[in-house]
Amino acid sequence: MADDKEMPAAVVDGHDQVTGHIISTTIGGKNGEPKQTISYMAERVVGTGSFGIVFQAKCLETGETVAIKKVLQDRRYKNRELQLMRVMDHPNVVCLKHCFFSTTSKDELFLNLVMEYVPESLYRVLKHYSSANQRMPLVYVKLYMYQIFRGLAYIHNVAGVCHRDLKPQNLLVDPLTHQVKICDFGSAKQLVKGEANISYICSRFYRAPELIFGATEYTTSIDIWSAGCVLAELLLGQPLFPGENAVDQLVEIIKVLGTPTREEIRCMNPHYTDFRFPQIKAHPWHKIFHKRMPPEAIDFASRLLQYSPSLRCTALEACAHPFFDELREPNARLPNGRPFPPLFNFKQEVAGSSPELVNKLIPDHIKRQLGLSFLNQSGT
C-alpha cells in the first residue's frame, strides 16, 4: 500500500455508525503515479475514550488489518497527534500508514489516523497473568521494558517529544514476536525549554510527582517515571502507586519513597513552597518486591523512581542497565526458542551519545556481525 503520511488528508463522507461500514478514501500517487482508492471495512471497536474511538478495520484492496483512530477535529487547529506521528519512524513506535478526514450528517469533522494493527496491549497481557494468579516471567519483563525504553529514547532524543501518557494501555504487544510499540500520541508534545505546559496530564497511577506538585516546566523525565511505574507493575502484578485521587497519589508515593526533602520539592517545582507533609521514612525497595527478586531489578526500579527529575536515568541509560544484560547474551532467545525481535539495530537514537554508552548498548556478538558486514561491503 502506498504510504501517504506526507500527503494532505482527503475528506470523505463518513458514517455516524462505525462497525460494518465501508470507508473509501483516495491517496495521492507519488512520483507521478496515479491516485489510488483505498477502502476499509470497519470490523470492531477496540478502544474508546474522551478523544473518540479506535476500531479495527480491513483494507479491502490488500486484505491488511489496520487500526483506525477516529477523533473529532476542531477546524480551527491542526491536529498535534497527526503532526507528531507523521515524523516518527521506529520499530518500537506504532506506525502511521496514512490519514483522512470524514464528515457526519451533523457536519462534524473527524480525523482518521490509519495505523498498523497490533493485537494486544501490555494492560491485557498483565490482566491475563493476574487472572491466572501468575507473575509475568522475568524474561518478558526485561524484553518489554527494554523495548519501551528504546522507543522512548527515539521519541525523546530524535523526535524531541514527550509522550505524557505512558501506561500499559498505551503499550502494544505482538503476541507472536513479542515486539512492543508505544501508541497513543494524543497527549504528546514537543517540549520547549522555558515554555509552560499543562501539569494535569498523564494517567494517575503513572503520573510523576512533579506533575502532582503542579510543575509546568517539566521535562521528558516524566515519561521515565511512568516507565518506572510500568516496570514495578510488571514485577509486582499490580500498580505500585494506586492513588484514588491526586492527593492520595502523592500519599502512595510518599509511603514508598518517604517524604521528599525541601531540595527534592524545589527540583520538582521551584514555585511550590507550601511544605506541610508528615515525615515518613522511605520503605526499603527490597521489601516492596518478593524475596527472590534479582538485585539488579530492584536497583533499576530505584534509578527510575526518583523524586528529582534530573536524577532519573535517561531512556538510553535505562537500556544499558545490567537488568537487561540477559537480552545481550549471544544465545538469548524467547522461551519457545524463537529469536527475540530486533533489539540492537540502533540508528538515530544513539546519535550524540558517549562511546562508553554505545559500547554498553551493542553486545560484542552484534559488533562482530556488524564488523563482518562492513568488511563485506568494502570488498575485503
Curated annotation (Swiss-Prot):
Its main location: cytoplasm. GO terms for biological process: brassinosteroid mediated signaling pathway; detection of brassinosteroid stimulus; leaf morphogenesis; multidimensional cell growth; negative regulation of brassinosteroid mediated signaling pathway; positive regulation of protein export from nucleus; protein autophosphorylation; protein phosphorylation. The modification Phosphotyrosine is found at Y200. The modification Phosphoserine is found at S105, S187, S310, S353. SUPFAM superfamilies: Protein kinase-like (PK-like). CDD domains: STKc_GSK3. The modification Phosphothreonine is found at T104, T220, T261, T314. Disruption phenotype: Increased stability of SPCH and formation of excessive stomatal and non-stomatal cell. Keywords: ATP-binding, Brassinosteroid signaling pathway, Cell membrane, Cytoplasm, Host-virus interaction, Kinase, Membrane, Nucleotide-binding, Nucleus, Phosphoprotein, Serine/threonine-protein kinase, Transferase, Ubl conjugation. Inactivated by an unknown mechanism after binding of brassinosteroids to the brassinosteroid receptor complex. Inhibited by lithium. Inhibited by dephosphorylation at Tyr-200 by BSU1. Competitive inhibition by KIB1 that reduces substrate (e.g. BZR1) access. Repressed by bikinin. InterPro entries: GSK-3, Kinase-like_dom_sf, Prot_kinase_dom, Protein_kinase_ATP_BS, Ser/Thr_kinase_AS, STKc_GSK3. It is a peripheral membrane protein. Interacts in vitro with the C-terminal fragment of BZR1 and with BES1/BZR2, but not through the kinase domain. Interacts with BHLH150, beet curly top virus AL4/C4 and tomato golden mosaic virus AL4/AC4. Interacts with YDA. Interacts with MKK4. Interacts with KIB1 and KIB2 in a brassinosteroid (BR)-dependent manner. Interacts with BSK1, BSK6, BSK8 and BSK11. Binds to WRKY46, WRKY54 and WRKY70. Component of a complex made of POLAR, BASL, ASK7/BIN2 and ASK3/SK12. Binds to POLAR and BASL. This is Shaggy-related protein kinase eta. The gene is ASK7.
